[in-house]
Design a protein with these regions (language model features):
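Short, surface-exposed ligand- or partner-binding patches at beta-edge/loop junctions that are enriched
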Residues: 67
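Rhodanese-like catalytic fold shared by cysteine-dependent sulfurtransferases
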Residues: 1-25, 32-63, 72-116
């Protein structure tokens, strides 16, 4: 199953905290340097280029939200995971947009993070 980017299931950044409380898993697909500079405290880091080899980490009983810097990479990952019959959503606008709605973005040292 292939989706165009406009068909990608997505959620808005202002919905994220409630969705995490409801049990959604947040997966950050950015590169290591991007993650180190700033990531959401509830996120799990699985870089985009390791998604296929990490499929055993995704369960069809769970719901996932994927995020990258702007939403493009995570959109492609979301479409792939959806094609595997796993409920998944892209975070619209990515980390750049999320930083306007969340105070839970930290660097790898636990200090206030930045999005690069």
């Amino acid at each position: 199953m292939v989706f165009g980017i406009s068909d990608t299931p997505s959620v808005e950044p202002e919905q994220l905290e409630n969705l995490i409380q409801d049990g959604f898993k947040l997966i950050d697909v950015r590169e290591q340097d991007e993650w180190n500079a700033g990531h959401h405290q509830s996120a799990e880091h699985i870089p985009m280029d390791t998604i296929t080899e990490s499929m055993d980490r995704f369960k069809d009983s769970e719901k996932y939200i994927f995020v990258c810097r702007s939403g493009a990479r995570s959109g492609r990952v979301t479409n792939f995971i959806v094609s595997q019959d796993i409920e998944s959503y892209n975070l619209s606008g990515g980390m750049k947009e999320l930083q306007n709605f969340s105070e839970k973005i930290f660097n790898s040292e636990g200090n206030s993070g930045q999005i690069i």
